[in-house]
Amino acid sequence: EHAILHLLYSRFFARAMIATGHLPDSAAEPFAALFTQGMVTHETYRSTDGRWLTPEEVRLDADAPIEIATGASVETGPSIKMSKSKKNVVDPDAIIAQYGADTARFFMLSDSPPERDVEWTAAGVEGAWRFIQRVWRYLDEVPAAAPTAEDSPAALALRKATHKTIAGVTADIEGFTFNKAVARLRELSNALSDSLGVADAPGLAFARREALETLLQLMNPMAPHLTEEMWATLGHDIPLVETPWPDADMTLARDDVILLPVQVNGKKRAELEVARDADKAAIETLVLSAPDVQRYLDGRAPKKVIVVPGRIVNVVV
């Protein structure tokens, strides 16, 4: 409601400025859409005599929460929108002093879709902080490296993960699904971490460095301060914010194997993994030999097999 009123005021101002000649007629509708974000929530705490308590006034013991000042037990309420009246607020200055602004921002974006409420938890903030620290440690583990003429399977797998992440995070940011973008960044970090345990192979050192630099570029909108420091530590003179957004190499980002749904008489009966470049004959052979499809054929020969490459297969009996 609050945001809607602001949009109405802005619309009235736009109309007035059109009337005075300060804006063109095309500005009559100044906003294309409204995106209403969720609220930040937290548990409520109440003393035995009915007083609302702030999270700082409560110690969360293993058995039950207690009031620090009195040692008395505390009633824990549901996680609801933070409000001064119920004192279920967290001081952002304290969080920033302990973890930094980037950690707070990263947690807020990672916990849930932006249109839904996000529950503020100490464990969630701690998890975001640990992830950022892990990325920082890569600076000592991933040296600069030049590309090689040919990539080993391990290098190719990591490069594919990197470029799939670029494509996914780009789409997620454009679609406001920031929590999915953060999840993809964690997956890329895991892939990079796993590669550090693999013996060196052709192209792997370059693939690691590419993954790390890409990780910093994609993290920059969410953790701008630390990623700028890390970027400079890697030896770059141009600030990260001034570098172009990475482009995904779709020949690497595209999966070699796809999941193809299979219908029998119009009803989905199976899903099969097939090579992306498989021809219709190969797909038909694979489908008809699949146990789930044979069960519905029950020994009968199909009247027709309709193959739409990359989309679906329908077996008519």
Identify the meaning behind each predicted range.
Residues 22-30, 94-273, 306-312:
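Helix-rich, typically C-terminal accessory recognition domains appended to large enzymatic cores
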Residues 36-46, 220:
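Short, conserved secondary-structure transition motifs
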Residues 277-297:
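A short, contiguous, amphipathic alpha-helix enriched in charged residues
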